[in-house]
């Protein structure tokens, strides 16, 4: 990456993008100038920085974790992971289940999902292990 002082001037940016209208070129110039300022700020010693990135990062983390309110004792990352896992499962269930707004399917067209052969064996093994554990208590 080029150091901030070697970055292109706003006029060079505007000339390099002839297909953009002037508003888009101005927006791009503003974003690039802001990016250059942030890079220059990161290049400066910590005590001379103009912006407080750590405070901003912590505030954004608090704001994003506030949307995942969970009083179960899990950490934010654990609860966020479970939310994503649940949302994927929920999405899959919603996709595979008929809704009131979907057209009614004929009973012959609906085929239930068959259980896998290993499903019952695993469950039986778990129950047997649980019975042995309880018997030893």
Curated annotation (Swiss-Prot):
Positions of modified residues (Phosphoserine): 67, 69, 71, 75, 91, 97
Low complexity composition-biased segments: 65-82
GO annotations of cellular component type: centrosome; cytoplasm; nucleolus; nucleoplasm; nucleus
Keywords: Cell cycle, Cytoplasm, Cytoskeleton, Nucleus, Phosphoprotein
Phosphothreonine: residues bearing it: 111
UniProt-listed Pfam families: RGCC
Segments of this protein annotated with the region Disordered: 57-116
Compartmental location: Cytoplasm; Nucleus; Cytoplasm, Cytoskeleton, Microtubule organizing center, Centrosome
Keyword Cytoplasm: yes
Source organism, top-level taxon: Eukaryota
GO biological process: cellular response to hypoxia; complement activation; fibroblast activation; G1/S transition of mitotic cell cycle; negative regulation of angiogenesis; negative regulation of blood vessel endothelial cell migration; negative regulation of cell-cell adhesion mediated by cadherin; negative regulation of endothelial cell proliferation
Main location group: cytoplasm
Keyword DNA-binding: no
GO MF annotations, alphabetized: protein kinase activator activity; protein kinase binding; R-SMAD binding
Quaternary assembly: Interacts with CDK1 and PLK1. Interacts with SMAD3.
Role this protein plays: Modulates the activity of cell cycle-specific kinases. Enhances CDK1 activity. May contribute to the regulation of the cell cycle. May inhibit growth of glioma cells by promoting arrest of mitotic progression at the G2/M transition. Fibrogenic factor contributing to the pathogenesis of renal fibrosis through fibroblast activation.
PANTHER family for this protein: REGULATOR OF CELL CYCLE RGCC
Name of the protein described by the UniProt record: Regulator of cell cycle RGCC
């Amino acid at each position: 990456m080029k150091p901030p002082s070697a970055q292109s001037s706003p006029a060079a940016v505007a000339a390099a993008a002839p297909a953009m209208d002037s508003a888009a070129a101005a927006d791009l110039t503003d974003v690039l100038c802001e990016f250059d300022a942030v890079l220059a700020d990161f290049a400066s010693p910590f005590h001379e920085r103009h912006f407080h990135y750590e405070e901003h990062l912590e505030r954004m983390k608090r704001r994003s974790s506030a949307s995942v309110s969970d009083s179960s004792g899990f950490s934010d990352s654990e609860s966020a992971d479970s939310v994503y896992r649940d949302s994927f499962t929920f999405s899959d269930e919603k996709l595979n289940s008929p809704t009131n707004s979907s057209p009614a399917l004929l009973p012959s067209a609906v085929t239930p999902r068959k259980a896998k052969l290993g499903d019952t064996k695993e469950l039986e093994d778990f129950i047997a292990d649980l019975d042995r554990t309880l018997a030893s208590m």
